[in-house]
């Protein structure tokens, strides 16, 4: 022990103190951007195997963005989900069939701490999903200089079926997926507001988080800004990254689900059903759907792919 603390803890405190006092590339090269908060929304983050809330390349890229932002000195704030069961592990049964096995992550053993409001209170944030509220609590993960905030619906305020909403990455049917993505996008914005964080730039890592743009539109319209001007401002301050041209990698929902869970929003925006659905309408061979990537592309001022060729194809 050193001053009552384990040696490892003392080393980490000394390391953090040393790193925090060093100038970063951003503070030296573009000091005007050093303290500009960037909100980075992603359905998964691959930070470390002690926090298994990722399934593949989308999460690994998100984790690398957090780490690189820390190294550069960019004030990046990640927003995602705390999945206690994470993504499934593959196992073969005795007869050679693939089985999906989920392992439970004990929050007390993970590198998490409760996220606190500016008043020092544990954050419990209500999120409107249709005619109901789903409540989320928030966990904080330090990724060097960057921060990651993970939403968790497993709280007493929720019904049992809502408590399971954030249990697994990419689990459930389309009903579960649209509810989860409403919480990620709309709930994520409200979480940042509750924590006193005001981003200047909003980055959507794939279309899963595209409902961020709908919540921000609502904020502007409620503040008295005309919808056309609100759309322009959201586009000016929002960017997105798309990861695959493969249709299975893009979420699209039937109109009736969008109506069921988001109908209060077109009333708050002062528009009708058709105008709202037009934000994300895409025609498939079987008919029209509400496409999350189309929503992201229409509501952002810049979009990129994960490579030059992929960006051109997408």
Describe each model-derived feature in a short phrase.
Residues 1-314:
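Catalytic cores of carbohydrate-active enzymes across secretory and cytosolic contexts
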């Amino acid at each position: 022990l050193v001053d009552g603390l384990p040696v490892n803890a003392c080393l980490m405190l000394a390391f953090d103190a040393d790193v925090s006092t060093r100038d970063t590339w951003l503070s030296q090269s573009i000091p005007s951007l050093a303290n500009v908060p960037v909100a980075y929304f992603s359905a998964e983050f691959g930070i470390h195997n002690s926090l298994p809330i990722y399934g593949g390349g989308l999460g690994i890229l998100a984790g690398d963005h957090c780490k690189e932002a820390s190294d550069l000195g960019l004030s990046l704030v990640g927003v995602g989900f705390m999945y206690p069961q994470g993504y499934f592990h593959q196992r073969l049964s005795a007869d050679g069939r693939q089985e999906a096995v989920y392992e439970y992550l004990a929050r007390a053993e993970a590198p998490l701490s409760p996220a606190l409001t500016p008043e020092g209170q544990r954050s419990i944030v209500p999120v409107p999903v249709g005619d109901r509220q789903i409540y989320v609590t928030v966990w904080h993960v330090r990724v060097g200089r960057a921060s990651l905030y993970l939403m968790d619906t497993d709280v007493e305020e929720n019904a049992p079926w809502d408590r399971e909403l954030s249990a697994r990455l990419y689990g459930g049917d389309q009903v579960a997926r649209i509810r989860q993505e409403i919480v990620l996008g709309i709930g994520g914005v409200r979480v940042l507001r509750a924590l006193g964080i005001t981003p200047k730039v909003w980055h959507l890592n794939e279309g899963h988080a595209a409902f961020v743009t709908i919540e921000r539109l609502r904020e502007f319209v409620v503040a008295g800004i005309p919808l056309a001007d609100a759309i322009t401002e959201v586009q000016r301050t929002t960017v997105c990254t798309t990861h695959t041209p493969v249709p299975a990698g893009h979420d699209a929902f039937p109109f009736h689900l969008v109506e069921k869970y988001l109908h209060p929003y077109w009333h708050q925006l002062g528009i009708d059903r058709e105008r709202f659905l037009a934000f994300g309408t895409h025609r498939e061979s079987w008919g029209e759907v509400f496409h999350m990537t189309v929503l992201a592309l229409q509501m952002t001022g810049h979009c990129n792919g994960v490579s030059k060729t992929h960006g051109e194809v997408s």
